[in-house]
From Swiss-Prot:
NCBIfam families: PRK00685.1. SUPFAM superfamilies: Metallo-hydrolase/oxidoreductase. SMART domains: Lactamase_B. Keywords: Hydrolase. It comes from Korarchaeum cryptofilum (strain OPF8). This is UPF0173 metal-dependent hydrolase Kcr_0055. One of its GO terms (molecular function) is hydrolase activity.
Length: 222
């Protein structure tokens, strides 16, 4: 069993035999249910890209304070290492293992101050979770679904900078995933997308998928 806890915006904590924090933007996150001082850290911190709302600086602080490894595209991982954190750089390619957690970085359509933006598939205790990072929809999501068969997808739906509900509905179809937790919505006024709209678009497409809309601090057991 893997517990998936939503920490607001695009931040998630995966808990099983290991702890994984993804895009751990805590300080300054208006949706965060915790303060960084309350965070226990993790074995692995995955940072999908270098924008201020995705937690590179918080990942570095937590790694230095509690241990664990910052995992990201090579250039971001090097920045984390330069600032004193344990880090492991990678690129889009294949599964690698870090501190008992399997990770593969995946394509994402976005921008990044350092390196290229990515998503990630995380394998923990026999379960696979796909965090898309910040991205628009792209047809290669079908490859991600076929290769890695995620049990759960964490998808942005806010629009403007990322997919909106319409685009996310196509992403779900391409991935072939049956369980989805929406993210990256309603944090700021421009991120207007809502889970209800995603459900409507899925209905129009005839796609059956469980949309699990978590409030910050709530968890889902996979």
């Amino acid at each position: 069993m893997v517990r998936v806890t939503f920490l607001g915006h695009s931040a998630f904590l995966l808990e099983g035999s290991k702890r994984v924090l993804i895009d751990p933007w805590i300080e300054g996150n208006p949706q965060s249910p915790i303060k960084i001082e309350e965070c226990k850290g993790a074995d692995v911190y995955i940072v999908t890209h270098d924008h201020g709302d995705h937690g590179l600086e918080d990942a570095i602080k937590l790694s230095k304070r509690h241990g664990g490894t910052v995992v990201s595209i090579y250039e971001i991982a090097e920045e984390a290492r330069r600032k004193g954190a344990n880090s492991l750089g990678a690129n889009i390619g294949s599964f690698f293992e870090v501190n008992g957690v399997k990770v593969v970085l995946t394509k994402a359509l976005h921008s990044s101050n350092l390196g290229a933006p990515v998503g990630a598939v995380i394998e923990l205790d026999g379960k696979r979770v796909y965090h898309a990072g910040d991205t628009g929809v792209f047809y290669d999501m079908k490859i991600i679904g076929e290769l890695y068969k995620p049990d759960l997808a964490l998808l942005p739906i806010g629009g403007h900078f990322v997919m909106g509900p319409l685009e996310a509905s196509l992403a779900i179809e391409l991935l072939g995933v049956s369980k989805v937790i929406p993210m990256h919505y309603q944090t700021f006024p421009v991120l207007k997308g809502k889970p209800e709209e995603l459900k409507e678009h899925l209905g129009r497409r005839g796609i059956k998928a469980e949309i699990i809309a978590l409030k910050p601090g709530e968890s889902y057991e996979l």
